[in-house]
Amino acid sequence: MLFRSEALEFFSIKVQDGPLTSRLQKIREGDIILVGRKATGTLITGNLIPGKRLLLLSTGTGLAPFASLIKDPDVYENYETIVLAHGCRQVSELAYGEHLVDGLRNHEFFGPLIRDKLVYYPTVTREPFRNRGRITDLIASNQMFDDIGQPGLDIETDRIMLCGSPAMLEELPAIFTARGFVEGNHSQPGHFVIEKAFVER
C-alpha cells in the first residue's frame, strides 16, 4: 500500500451502552486492539461493478468508513474521480472531514497523486455555508454536481457508497433505483452499496 499509517483513527459518536462505542471510548494507550486483515461489511469496492466516478455519500459520523477508502491507492487506480460528500447540521461538525482531506492533499507523497482526483463536497443544513442542504436533495436536484462542475448521475460511469443517517439511507437508494441503479452485495456487485449497520434499527 502506498499510503500507510501506523495509527488507527476512530470517528464515532458515543452511544450510551452501545456495544462498540461504550468500549471504544474507554481505550487507553497500551491497550490491545485486534484488527482483522480483511475488510468486511457492505462498503467494499468489490461489491461495485467497475466505473469511472466513485461517489462517497455520508452524513455525520457516516464519514468514518470513507476515511480509509480515500487513503487507499487502489481506489485512485480504479476510478478517475472520487467525490466525497459529507453532510452535517452545523459547520463545526465538518471539521474532521476537512482535516482529513486537507491532510491527504498536502501529504508529501500521496498528495500529488490524488489532488486532481479527490473532490470534497461539505454541506450543512442549519447554518449559512457555501454548500447548503441535505445530500439527498442536492443529488436529486443535481445541485451538488453543478456545484462541483461535473455532470449529473450517470448509470454507465457512477458507482456509489452510502453511509449515514437512516433517512438518507432510505431516500437515496429509492432515487438511485428509480434511475435504474442496482444495489450491490458480496454475491452480486452493483452500482451502489449501503452501510447496513446504520440501516438496521
Q: Could you tell me what each predicted segment is?
A:
Residues 40-49:
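Short, Lys/Arg- and Gly-enriched loop/turn segments at beta-strand edges
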